[in-house]
C-alpha cells in the first residue's frame, strides 16, 4: 500500500513522523507523508515561510515572496492554523500552557531558573514575577527590543510595576551598578565583543530608569538574571503556580482570546507559522 492509500486511522496524530525538510534558506515544507495519513489519503504539502523579521539582512531576505509559486503545485498550501508538529493549546490558554507548549527548553529554563533564584533570595513576589516573565518575548515571539515587547504582552495581566521592570531590564542590563552588586555580564563580552557600546537611546533609557521609584525592581531582575543558565538544573513551572495565581490576572477566555490590545501577540505564539 502506498502512503497515498493509507487509511486516516492508521496512526494516532501525535505519533506521526515529521516529514519536514528545508526549502530555500530558512523556510520549510511538510511533505505529504504525515498529511496523507491524517487527511484520509488526500495528502498535502504545507509550506512554512519565515517572516520578514527573521530574514531581513540575510541572504533569505525576500524569500517569502519567492515561495509564492509553491502554491501552484498540486496539493500545496501555505501553513495556516495549527502546525501538527507543535503541541495544540487548550481552549482557554493559561500562562503555564505557554511555558509548557511553546517556550523552548532553553528559554523556559532560563526564565524558571531566574525566578527560582529570586525566590530563594526571599524577594518580593513582584520581583519574582518580573524574573519569570522578563524574557518572555524572546521565548516565544521576538528577540530585538524584547523588554518592550514583553512588557506590552503582559501589561493587561500584571501589576504596572512588574511590566515596567520587564521593560527597563532590557536597558539596565548593559550598565553596571556596583553599589547593589550588579556587574556587566561576562557573557555579553563573549556575545557582543569587548568593544560593544549600547546605542545612545538605550543609555538614556537606563539613566532615566535609575531615577525611577521602581528602579530596584527592574535592577533585581538583572541581578537575578541567569546569563549562562545551568542546563542540568530542573525547575518546574508548577513551583510558581501560587505566585502566578496571586500576581497574574488570567483572562476567563484565555490568553489570546480575551479581546485585549495584546491578544494578537499571544495568538501569534499559538500559531507562529501562519503565512498571514
Regions found by a protein language model. Name each.
Residues 2-43, 49-276:
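Metal-dependent phosphohydrolase cores
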Amino acid at each position: 500500500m502506498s502512503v497515498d492509500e493509507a487509511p486516516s486511522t492508521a496512526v494516532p496524530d501525535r505519533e506521526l513522523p515529521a516529514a519536514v525538510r528545508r526549502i530555500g534558506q530558512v523556510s520549510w515544507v511538510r511533505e505529504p507523508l504525515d498529511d496523507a495519513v491524517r487527511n484520509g489519503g488526500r495528502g498535502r504539502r504545507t509550506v512554512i515561510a519565515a517572516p520578514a523579521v527573521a530574514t531581513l539582512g540575510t541572504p533569505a531576505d525576500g524569500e517569502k515572496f519567492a515561495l509564492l509559486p509553491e502554491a501552484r503545485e498540486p496539493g500545496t498550501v501555505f501553513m495556516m492554523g495549527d502546525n501538527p508538529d507543535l503541541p495544540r493549546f487548550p481552549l482557554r490558554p493559561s500562562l503555564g500552557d505557554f511555558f509548557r507548549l511553546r517556550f523552548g527548553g532553553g528559554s523556559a529554563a532560563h526564565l524558571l531558573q531566574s525566578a527560582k533564584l529570586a525566590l530563594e533570595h526571599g524577594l518580593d513576589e513582584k520581583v519574582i514575577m518580573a524574573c519569570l516573565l522578563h524574557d518572555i518575548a524572546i521565548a516565544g515571539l521576538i528577540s530585538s527590543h524584547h523588554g518592550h515587547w514583553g512588557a506590552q504582552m503582559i501589561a493587561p495581566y500584571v501589576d504596572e510595576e512588574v511590566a515596567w521592570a520587564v521593560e527597563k531590564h532590557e536597558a539596565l542590563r548593559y550598565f553596571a551598578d556596583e553599589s547593589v552588586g550588579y556587574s556587566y555580564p561576562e557573557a555579553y563580552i563573549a556575545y557582543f565583543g569587548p568593544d560593544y557600546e549600547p546605542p545612545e537611546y538605550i543609555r538614556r533609557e537606563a539613566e532615566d530608569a535609575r531615577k525611577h521609584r521602581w528602579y530596584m525592581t527592574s535592577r533585581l531582575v538583572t541581578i537575578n538574571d541567569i546569563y549562562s543558565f545551568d542546563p542540568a538544573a530542573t525547575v518546574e513551572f508548577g513551583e510558581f503556580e501560587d505566585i502566578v495565581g496571586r500576581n497574574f490576572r488570567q483572562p476567563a477566555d484565555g490568553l489570546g482570546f480575551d479581546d485585549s490590545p495584546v491578544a494578537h501577540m499571544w495568538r501569534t505564539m499559538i500559531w507562529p507559522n501562519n503565512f498571514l
